[in-house]
Amino acid sequence: MTSSNISICATEDQMVLQTSLLLRVNVILMTTVAIFTFVLTYRALFILKQRPIFHKSTKILLYTSLIFVNIHEIIFMVIQCVAFIRSFTLSDKPCEIMRTTLECRFKNHVLIFGIAGMNFNQFGLTVDRLLATVIPQTYSHLGSFPGILISILVIGCSIAAPLIIAIGDPYDDIVPNCFFFPQHSAPRANVFLIILSALVIASIFLNLIIIFANKKLEKGTRYYVSQRYQKREALISTRIIVYIAASQFLGMVLYSTIVLTLRLHKSMIPVSMYHNIVWWAYTVPFAAVALPALLIHRINLVGSNRKRVINRITAKVETQEEHMKSLKELWG
């Protein structure tokens, strides 16, 4: 089938969807989430620079994660805002309101690049934490090298993801929005969604093992200050990564599970209902905003705990001094 003999006009159901209040509310909500992501990212970058909680390698990977998050939010906001404008300006033009997958190709590729990068880099953070646990001495001397190498691999895999999904796709069908996968790429898109879910689940599982291992190792190095500091740093970093992985898990598993289920039963679902559910099931922006938000929260929490410990020690010293002063006065 070629693009010349395919109808580009929207059906009655598709027109209802494209001009519905639900779509417009969804766009406003997701755009608000994107703006929050940008603001929180700025704050997270500032805190990452100021607070020396993470190893250089981990910090580079966190910077990479924030870049992917914002690439995704920028392209998704552009896609959504275009859909919002078209829902008003083309509300009476059914043969113009739909998008061809060919004209959506670049935006769709960038969107998949962002989604893949967010998830692949999350797994990269887990590998980084694994290295810090298994070979702590070597890892500490490698500096930023592991983070740079993993980031390069993540970027390469993320570039490859949309290209592999689109292999052989003629781009001859129409979609209501550029974040929908082309029809001919659907089987590979389904595999992609399954891989993302599997990676997130693996990340959480491995991070929990790493936390347990670091707790055990920390007890075993109680009297070795340098080694205990390394284990404590690894434990704190890994806990933060687990919280981030959990947010990614909720966002990606919800999205991939719902969308995969819809794809497998697409023939049984009315068109307008199918696309409405897909729009609202796209929970990736919430996973995106959770990254800088959780980074800020967890780093501030670590800082507050440290201050509390220091204040407790200081208070204890002052109490001892007052006690000695009292004894001197008593015996003086």
UniProtKB/Swiss-Prot annotation:
Annotated TM spans: 27-47, 65-85, 110-132, 147-167, 192-212, 240-260, 277-297
Q: Which sequence ranges are listed under topological domain Extracellular? A: 1-26, 86-109, 168-191, 261-276
Biological process annotations from GO: detection of chemical stimulus involved in sensory perception
Keywords on record: Membrane, Transmembrane, Transmembrane helix
State the Pfam families in the record.
7TM_GPCR_Sra
Q: Which residue intervals are topologically Cytoplasmic?
A: 48-64, 133-146, 213-239, 298-332
One MF term from GO for this chain?
A: olfactory receptor activity
Grouped into one coarse class, the protein's main location is membrane
Q: Where in the cell is it found?
A: Membrane
Membrane topology of the entry: Multi-pass membrane protein
Task: Show the GO cellular component annotation of the record.
Answer: membrane
The record's comment on protein family reads: Belongs to the nematode receptor-like protein sra family.
Q: What is this protein called?
A: Serpentine receptor class alpha-10
Gene from which this protein is expressed: sra-10
